[in-house]
């Protein structure tokens, strides 16, 4: 089985999300799947593209037998909502460049999409499910925009909340399958 994992984070980045996605990719590989990962140039948790990756729009590498396709993103750890949105949208846009550059997309049996960030997951669902007709599974690690409301970063019922809530429903409605990190998420 050929699997593409789309994630905003991946090793050598540090933290829970990169560790989970890296472990998932390596676990699937150990079970005999052919796994590719589509991700950003590494920049987390510092918010700066790592040394060895700077000055590039993309980089393909093989890590533990997994093809990793990395694309530029506007890297930031700013709390500023506008800068965070630009970061997410920059990678969401790069997904489209990948799709039309890499001809083997039609060969993927499954595409696993990490959510959040919602703009990336929404773009990936549109691209891989709607345009290329691939079976898509969404790995939910946090409920957005609910988490943002609970953290006080967003107001329920505001325009931004409504946009994120619409994207969230769109992702869930269009995925072929959904799995999460806990019972509360499912």
Language model features: what each stretch is:
Residues 109-110, 177:
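Structural motif
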Residues 79-83, 148-154:
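Short acidic, glycine/proline-rich loop/turn micro-motifs
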Residues 39-102:
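A conserved catalytic-core segment of Leloir-type glycosyltransferases
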Residues 1-64:
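N-terminal subdomain of nucleotide-sugar transferases
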Residues 84-100, 110-147:
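An aromatic- and histidine-rich active-site surface loop
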Residues 100, 126-132, 159-178:
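Membrane-proximal helix-turn-helix segments that form the acceptor-binding/catalytic region
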Residues 181-184:
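Carbohydrate-associated surface elements
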């Amino acid at each position: 089985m050929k699997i593409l994992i789309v994630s905003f984070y991946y090793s050598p980045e540090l933290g829970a999300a990169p560790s989970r996605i890296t472990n998932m990719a390596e676990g699937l590989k150990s079970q005999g799947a052919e796994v590719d990962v589509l991700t950003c140039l590494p920049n987390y948790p510092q918010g700066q593209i790592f040394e060895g990756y700077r000055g590039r729009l993309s980089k393909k590498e093989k890590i533990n037998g997994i093809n990793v396709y990395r694309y530029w993103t506007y890297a930031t750890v700013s709390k500023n909502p506008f800068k965070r949105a630009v970061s997410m949208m920059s990678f969401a846009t790069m997904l489209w460049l990948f799709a039309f550059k890499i001809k083997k997309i039609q060969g993927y049996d499954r595409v696993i999409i990490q959510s959040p960030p919602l703009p990336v997951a929404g773009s990936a669902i549109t691209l891989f499910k709607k345009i290329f007709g691939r079976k898509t599974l969404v790995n939910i690690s946090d409920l957005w925009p609910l988490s943002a409301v609970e953290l006080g970063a967003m107001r329920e019922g505001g325009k931004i909340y409504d946009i994120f809530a619409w994207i969230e429903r769109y992702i869930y409605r269009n995925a072929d399958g959904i799995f999460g990190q806990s019972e509360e998420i499912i």
